[in-house]
Amino acid sequence: MLRIAILGRPNVGKSSLFNRMCKQSLAIVNSQEGTTRDRLYGEIRGWSVPVQVIDTGGVDKDSEDHFQKHIYKQALAGAGEADILLLVIDIRCGITEQDAAIAKQLLPLKKPLILVANKADTLKDEHHVHELYKIGISEILTVSASHDKHIDRLLQKIKTLANIPEIAEEPVEEIEEEAQISSHEILSPEESLSDYEEEEILFSKPPASDKPLKIALIGRPNVGKSSIINGLLNEERCIIDNIPGTTRDNVDILYSHNDRSYLFIDTAGLRKMKSVKNSIEWISSSRTEKAIARADICLLVIDATHCLSSYDKRILSLISKHKKPHIILANKWDLIKGVRMEHYIRDLRSTDVYIGQSRILCISAAKKRNLRHIFSSIDELHETVSRKVPTPVVNKTLASALQKHHPQVINGRRLRIYYAIHKTATPFQFLLFINAKSLLTKHYECYLKNTLKTSFNLYGIPFDLEIKEKAKRTN
């Protein structure tokens, strides 16, 4: 994989360039300095090799500010792991002392280095290019990230430096011919889907993918999300402080554990709109829900020393809304004294209907207690979500439930379930064919869902019952 790091002092347009290169808005862009605090990871798609772009925070080497020291450390780490470095400056300001200091740090790394003179919005701005060579970097390109100007030229220069070949395009005629052949092979001319009974239509899990499992860490500010990431990875990847909202962007972190790849999405804390005081915090809050939608599995981090808050319940309802498998991580467990873990979990389950259906793991990021169980819990949950429940097992389970608690008689009729299938895994859904929807009460539907949940260990997996009426077949 080719890795490209974007570096520079604050407010020169690094995040705008990052978004242009990745062709999506992954980094928050704002005129306020220090918007990007952690390393952000994106990818350039459509190249012949995998390409990762690393956006780093604005570097101020001499600052005594607590955050700036962390940002400087993160930026150097990003430069260290990259193959190609992009030093971004504001061409309207020329070469500043900060720009020169950063270049002095990067040149000894002996890596391909491009000086990207950003904010060259007009031809007049580009007239000052010759003045930039005094910084000691031979490769200089002018761009305007905000106007999408010369970005393609920059990408082509990166390809040249990295010796990346272009992808040969397949002729349109060959693609169309292949599509026509494939469509004819689906069914023979004598067959159609109507020839098959619904019972015979099989639903199987998708083929195994080598893509990383996307894990979103969700939670209100200051519950320890970044501490958990750093504890899992044994590396300080996310800036940590006791000020709520330290992480503003969603930070993508790729990690391999036991031959499996995980993409952790460390999110900004989600807050009620009343507490969102500026545009950056609002964008961060909205991105939390986007991270939920993007993830394969969500880890909801709560503070074990506090009661479940309305924020926590709101986040959990968002996870349920998006039908995402999830695990609740009760962090700061080391601060709980005199309470047995099973009693805490039991009491926590009783506080909210969604909590009662969730998987719960008590951990301590500060003491690194039970962190090793997070990976095994993720793997177990993913395996449960990925499997297909055999149709005979589904029907046997529901038949047993009907026998155990008979549905009530309504207008002289009783509910009958002819058959059921596990229809889809993402989202998890069962399809039931019954005699009449009017005979399935909400109470009894809840009973059937609880039966399926306990029988197939579907805790932490929101699922639905799709109900279809099927008239009794007469010969």
Swiss-Prot record:
Gene3D superfamilies: 3.30.300.20, P-loop containing nucleotide triphosphate hydrolases
Record InterPro entries: G_ENGA (IPR031166), GTP-bd (IPR006073), GTPase_Der (IPR016484), KH_dom-like (IPR032859), KH_dom-like_a/b (IPR015946), P-loop_NTPase (IPR027417), Small_GTP-bd (IPR005225)
Task of the protein: GTPase that plays an essential role in the late steps of ribosome biogenesis.
Protein name, per record: GTPase Der
Segments forming domain KH-like: 387-471
Highest taxon in the source lineage: Bacteria
Alphabetized UniProt keyword annotations: GTP-binding, Nucleotide-binding, Repeat, Ribosome biogenesis
Complex formation: Associates with the 50S ribosomal subunit.
HAMAP family listed in its UniProt record: GTPase_Der
Native organism taxonomy: Bacteria, Pseudomonadati, Chlamydiota, Chlamydiia, Chlamydiales
Residues that coordinate or bind GTP 1: 8-15, 55-59, 118-121
One Pfam family in the UniProt entry: MMR_HSR1
Entry's Gene Ontology BP terms: ribosome biogenesis
